[in-house]
């Protein structure tokens, strides 16, 4: 039905007859001349109906309206120089219509696809929202990413293997979506939260390099970067060290950024989990933000330096200094607003100081700020030297008297807010990093052990006896890839020993009966020569969100759910 896409026509097509199919984006009737912008997935082309060249076609064109779907045959010609539209890729040419047919008419649209619309209408009429050029670009970018994935994985010897969508209910960390069985009354399947167990079983089978692009399902509270169903680039290997996997995945991500954005990513920094939590207060820090934290708790954990706002019987005070480059510009009103904000995040107290050095001499300085009311000069000098503060900076010192709460997490929100408010973050740059050496376990609010990553993650340089002795001291062989504050990939070496996996299940409080009932087939597989294996999963939605500059993964999913897990277009669930 067509010989070319509208958005691909250029000067090389001048003089050629083309057949186009698409939707009328704009319609302009000047009597003897009618112009339409015809739109398809590749863009728009101006079409001219000239009464002096084809009177019958021009008269028929008067019936056309916006969003009619038509087929059109015409001749490509160059536009006069004074009529070239440099704002669009086809702006140097137009098509003179010879004939057309209306494939379908259109009612007036319930939303204006040339503008931004309210979120509810966009989701209700998603099939129309997707007609917007920006949405076409986002979905096409997503498709290009998937093509790169397949090409790279095949070149590296990975096999594309599908795993089941109907599987067993297992305690993987989030709630399952349950599918009742019609044939087996009273029994249920679960939609997979990830292909974790099955890809490990593939390693046991001998498929040493596996990948797939697959849907995963988690019934959890949603955020801007989460959906109840999401797409994962799932990868698993045998006989490969975690260092080698990270190197290979770095190459993979570099290729995606190069081909999609023509950007060469810089060095992938590497931090331990402990380092990023201490320095940035987050396990997914945005390294474009220059604000860094410094632990100065040791200066205040003595009776001599006890602060009036800290409980008298508390010697476990946490104190974190946070240097803000170019923060001297902040007014007292702004500072007060940040203090209020930090306390809303749970902080006990936030002090501040500005320092003006005379003639760049650090020994001659003028100090201004609330710290002078609480901190002596000697202690303050130690803090200033530790943070290497400059004249244009402001220094915040946050305090908390509850050692069971992480003060850096509280300050992380303030760090992010300051970075955005003061325009300290270079929005056009990329800051990739790896985070390694996560704790194997943590305790929840009930004092129970839970996995930091998942229950199949291998401990690092640790045997079963060491694991049992003090689980909270054990480091895992886990790693995350983070770019610009967004975790795009997470992986680990897996447990391939029956005894180690059983020990982990025991620590997590999974009874022997539940181990057999829920994981019996998997535990049996570990007895039959399971190889050392490791892997990683990337969030396709998050990668597409980053590469398109979108603020929400809904923008890169064709038919997403709302934050309440509702499809308001199809009215699901019902």
From Swiss-Prot:
Gene3D superfamilies (alphabetical): Bira Bifunctional Protein, Domain 2, GAD-like domain, Nucleic acid-binding proteins
UniProt keyword terms in alphabetical order: Aminoacyl-tRNA synthetase, ATP-binding, Cytoplasm, Ligase, Nucleotide-binding, Protein biosynthesis
Chain positions recorded as ATP binding sites: 218-220, 227, 487, 539-542
Keyword flag Protein biosynthesis: yes
InterPro entries for the chain: Aa-tRNA-synt_II, aa-tRNA-synth_II, aa-tRNA-synth_II/BPL/LPL, Asp-tRNA-ligase_1, Asp-tRNA-ligase_1_N, Asp/Asn-tRNA-synth_IIb, AspRS_core, GAD-like_sf
Binding-site residues for L-aspartate, renumbered to this chain: 172, 218, 453, 494
Record's subcellular location: Cytoplasm
Pfam families: GAD, tRNA-synt_2, tRNA_anti-codon
Listed GO MF terms: aspartate-tRNA ligase activity; ATP binding; nucleic acid binding
Aspartate: region residues: 196-199
PROSITE patterns in alphabetical order: AA_TRNA_LIGASE_II
EC number: 6.1.1.12
Catalytic activity of the protein: tRNA(Asp) + L-aspartate + ATP = L-aspartyl-tRNA(Asp) + AMP + diphosphate
GO aspect biological process, one term: aspartyl-tRNA aminoacylation
Major place of residence: cytoplasm
Gene Ontology cellular-component annotations: cytoplasm
Record note on quaternary structure: Homodimer.
Function according to Swiss-Prot or TrEMBL: Catalyzes the attachment of L-aspartate to tRNA(Asp) in a two-step reaction: L-aspartate is first activated by ATP to form Asp-AMP and then transferred to the acceptor end of tRNA(Asp).
Family: Belongs to the class-II aminoacyl-tRNA synthetase family. Type 1 subfamily.
UniProt-recorded name of the protein: Aspartate--tRNA ligase
Gene symbol of the encoding locus: aspS
